[in-house]
Amino acid sequence: MQISFYSFLFSIAISSIFIVLLYFFRKKIAFCNHYGLYTILGLYAVTFVRMALPFEFGFTNTISDHSFYPVVIDALTPDKKNFFVPEFTWLNLIFTIWIAVSVILIIRAIYKYHKAIKILKKTVIEPKPELQAQLDAVAKQCKIKSMVKLRISDSISSPVTYGFIKPVVLFSNQTFTNEEFNFIATHECCHIKNKDIWIKLLTEIYCGIFWWNPLVYLLKKDLSFCLELRC
């Protein structure tokens, strides 16, 4: 297996087409009912991996292109004698900009998450013991081994789950019936059990790396929708 500029372009093209097809097929109720949501999520995972690992496999045959591809390569890697810096090529410049922007976007996403959680933690209050016990019972039913903490906040209008290692379910400060509480708690525990917060983190990193491809944002939006449907 090896990575070349051609294999990179090919994997981007195939993955982008796949994202668009999955997006439109997912909207078809018959398709979802027949193949199921887990199949769609699995196909999105394959798209993830293919774009992130643009290898040329030994069992594949490379299609020869003597018109478009050579022109692109010649334009991106011109004769170095024409430049003051011998190591300069347009390809190196594009790669440098790509990496620099990716690092900035990933750091910004991590910072925004950390800042949001820090603000939320300042507004939380301890719940009544019976509510924590109720959440513990739901978490046990969902077969979650780790402790799931319950916190209450006035600064949110809908439930929020955060914490990669020690999950916390944050409820808005309002009165819920037992049925409403159990329904919301089950939904949030489903996210915890399925490691959805890790999937969303990987999606943010993925979008940070491939920020120049508008279709990854379509994937992010649709994947988030699928994760909600799964719970």
Show where each model-derived region lies:
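Membrane-interfacial helical/loop segments at transmembrane boundaries in membrane proteins
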Residues: 65-83
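Membrane-embedded and juxtamembrane structural elements of multi-pass membrane proteins
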Residues: 2-68, 85-231
